[in-house]
Amino acid sequence: MSQQSRLANTFATARAEHRAALIGYLPAGYPDLAGSIATCRAMVESGCDIVEVGVAYSDPVMDGPTIQAAAEQALRGGVRVRDVFSVVEAITAAGGQAVVMSYWNPVLRYGVERFARDLAAAGGAGIITPNLIPEEADDWFIASATHNLDRIFLVAPSSTEERLVKTLEASRGFIYAASTMGVTGARDAVSSAAPALCARIRAHSDIPIGVGLGVRNGAQAAEIASYADGVIVGSALVSAAGEGLDAVRALTSELAEGVRSATVAS
């Protein structure tokens, strides 16, 4: 009855290699559209298993200053919602898996069914929806089922047990575990709340867990890879993208080494 997650093979491969999956992030259109395509390609070639392609949005309430500034630059450069599909196509062509990360408002404006259709046509695996809760996602449930797309919702240390269970039941592909409360951004120390949140998730579900918010180097990636199925890196890669492709390749390679060096929980 239920369709196979597009990302299931990616996580299964990583597990078979005794490592976590490396999940990168970049807004489409940063530093410009061609630059974002080249950057995402470099991420895949340097060890990213999955790339989250961000849809730049004018009111990014959950994003820290690095990602906000990148989104503003992309919007000033004239990026459109549909440009995200060009980036997704490039990631898929490079051999990576692409998911879109978007506030729900741009998807609603584009049209939920139309967005799902165009994302699937571009080879995308699903959507991460940071400000959408399952109770308000009826249109997305229908469209994601029609086009076999993964639904990746967020949970946080503050999520109640009831909220956690509801969100896990609604999710497919992986669950996005925000390891700290508050906005995104690279940090010196990774939150101690993340392992406890992962343990709570595993008490209810065997869905792969991606942990994000704060990773900026290989050592932190290794730390998270010891208890999570996926290590999500956003702000640090966006900062590297501002420096150029060599910086992106170097950081991605370091992170890819990190997720491989950890003693991974089986």
Curated annotation (Swiss-Prot):
GO molecular function, one term: tryptophan synthase activity
Keywords carried by this UniProt record: Amino-acid biosynthesis, Aromatic amino acid biosynthesis, Lyase, Tryptophan biosynthesis
Catalytic activity: (1S,2R)-1-C-(indol-3-yl)glycerol 3-phosphate + L-serine = D-glyceraldehyde 3-phosphate + L-tryptophan + H2O
One Pfam family per UniProt: Trp_syntA
GO cellular component: cytosol
EC number: 4.2.1.20
Pathway participation: Amino-acid biosynthesis; L-tryptophan biosynthesis; L-tryptophan from chorismate: step 5/5
Active site: E52, D63
InterPro entries in UniProt: Aldolase_TIM (IPR013785), RibuloseP-bd_barrel (IPR011060), Trp_synthase_alpha_AS (IPR018204), Trp_synthase_suA (IPR002028)
CDD domains: Tryptophan_synthase_alpha
ATP-binding is among the record's keywords: no
HAMAP family: Trp_synth_alpha
Subunit structure: Tetramer of two alpha and two beta chains.
Role summary: The alpha subunit is responsible for the aldol cleavage of indoleglycerol phosphate to indole and glyceraldehyde 3-phosphate.
Protein name: Tryptophan synthase alpha chain
Source species: Nocardia farcinica (strain IFM 10152)
Lineage: Bacteria, Bacillati, Actinomycetota, Actinomycetes, Mycobacteriales
